[in-house]
């Protein structure tokens, strides 16, 4: 299943933060979105998920399905998962209760079939063995890295085809962050499409197939990860000092 974002423009009320942004990711691939803080990376994910208050133009498609008129709940049902920044779990609920809550975002036939839900739980514990060991522990007692794993595992319970991750390594120790990136690479091997916003450039590029650089709400550059193997060049892109040798996105005003 391919996720396609085509020339999306929008923002928060009268404040426009995205200016004709396009992106895509296909099954079994990771597209990494890079950019400075405030560049519009999270706003792009919010637009895809249905959380951006104002979308003035453009389209978001999941396969052949146009998502523009769907609610965030309906987008999850369609196969989209979104793990927001900040280890968003229910701290007073157990690990297993958190995972079961992930099942309430899917169609009721799924919930009535206990075996399917149990299969989803088993898969979550297979992906994250540490969660299986702590299934009866309240989430608030988990480490930061374990809470992030739980947030990702919960998003995967409905068996999505596309997963969006907003800075999953934020606030994690380097060793734990590597575990999270290894998990993302595992999702790629399973055939999921992954749209990843990250600040840890080296780790992100190591698992990426394609890269998009956003600057001031516009795509500054995009291309296969092989175009971004020059660390100095990537640093310059972060600082907004150019993108020589990379494919430039067309300016929407030129259309």
Where are these regions (language model features)?
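ABC-type ATPase nucleotide-binding domains, specifically the catalytic core motifs of the NBD
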Residues: 13, 53, 95, 100-116, ...
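The feature captures the beta-strand-to-loop junction immediately N-terminal to the Walker
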Residues: 34-36
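Conserved ABC transporter NBD signature motif
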Residues: 57-65, 78, 112, 116-121
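Conserved ABC ATPase signature
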Residues: 138-142
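ABC ATPase C-loop
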Residues: 155-156
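Catalytic Walker B motif of ABC-type/P-loop ATPase nucleotide-binding domains
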Residues: 163-167
